[in-house]
Amino acid sequence: MSVFVDIHVLQTLPPSNPNRDDTGAPKSATFGGVQRMRISSQAIKRATRQDFEGKIADGNYGVRTKKIVELVARTITEKRPDLEAESIKLAEMGLKAIGFKLAEPRGNKSDKELKESGFLVFLSAKQIEHVADALISVAHEDDPAAAFKELKPRSLVDTDHSIDIALFGRMVAEPNALNVDAACQVAHAIGVGAVEHEYDYYTAVDDEKKRNDEADEGAGMIGTIEFASATVYRYATINVDLLRENLGDDAVTDRAVELFVDSFVRSMPTGKVTTFANRTLPDAVLVQVRNDQPINMSGAFEEPIVAGQHGFAKPAIKRFVEFEARLRELTGLEAVESLVSWTTPRGESFSELGKQVRLASLGETAAEAVRGTR
């Protein structure tokens, strides 16, 4: 029996541009025959991962970089300052033995630049330490490379996955044996109704020009910023069994569930945030622990909400509550546990869907519900 944690969020965004396309416009998608505001899953995952970065104990957070030679060499030097002169050579040897292809940085002719991997590599702090420790142990062997190969070097980076690697996965082109399947899936956030993009025309004043009576009074700079507003439906799911497999420990798995739920619910990509300050909390949240399958409920909004005097959020909440109840009635699929939270009076109808939990305790309570399934 597989266990899943589904997270459903309805959140109002004021005029903003949290996730823009290559033209600078807020991302969008056609759904239900109309254009909707969209926030990409990649941007949401990045914001979620950044949010729980400071909440994870040392070693349980990963780093994604091409500069793996620099990372390993620095760790060797920190542990054994006497090996500083050899650290780069050792790091390159070890990483090549693991299977990473290293090359000179593109477009940089500096002799000080160390070799890089050809792609971003996602490693946990513990894995970097394991590689450094193994290299230190063979540093004074007659043939360090041969001695290192005897340590089964790939195993050094295929155990002790950090929480973020276990959740979001790791794709390695070479060696692909180091791939880690992601335990979470994140949907693109989608507006519940049609969106209209607008433009903010702005001018920047040249302070020195303003002080000069003889200078022209024109602006120092003019431009436009495209923005939109919407109530969006956000969804993510965690495969708890796969998360446990990736992490190898029940307690760490529970902590990962807690962190992900809290950070997914309360984080948001920060595009143009200094211009729009669009840091809102969700209007309403439903977290369900299931033992059947994940269920994305975006179908509740395939027919776009048409805003009236009550805006988008209130009718969207009503629509979602009715959709979820009807879905249970028609399918017979019931969650093991349903937890709800809301931050505005219009979200109170979510009380029909499950047990009310304060937003600050949602992740902790979800982790407790997961423990109850064992």
Show where each model-derived region lies.
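Basic polyanion-binding and macromolecular-assembly surfaces
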Residues: M1-R38, Q42-R374
